[in-house]
């Protein structure tokens, strides 16, 4: 569903608008063949992957250490900046701080991705961080930056983000 709205953000609306009168139509990012092949590739890992569509903090509290030791937590919380304009359910600064504390105590490998903001870098300052550029193509074309934050049990060297991008493409 991420590909049917504006960068996965519900309040942004669908690409091209409800009337599909914009320059970009819904199929600009919803390429059936490409998405189908990605789903098939991902499906080959289905016995090893569990997806949870819930709040990151609630997930950590619910699962925490009850998962196998080799469980990787990948958390993608709402953006820090402009969240109230992008999401129906967004975090307040105190929620981001509470999540950072819970993640720091998590005894499992973890990775968190965020919009690159000084407040986020400070909250996760004890952990390795990798900033990377991102092109926003829905709406006005713009460049931004995001940050990947790696827990102490993640053993990676070099630019992990560029490696992941190669796999995901």
Short names for language-model regions:
Residues 88, 92-169:
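Long, positively charged, glycine-interspersed low-complexity recognition regions
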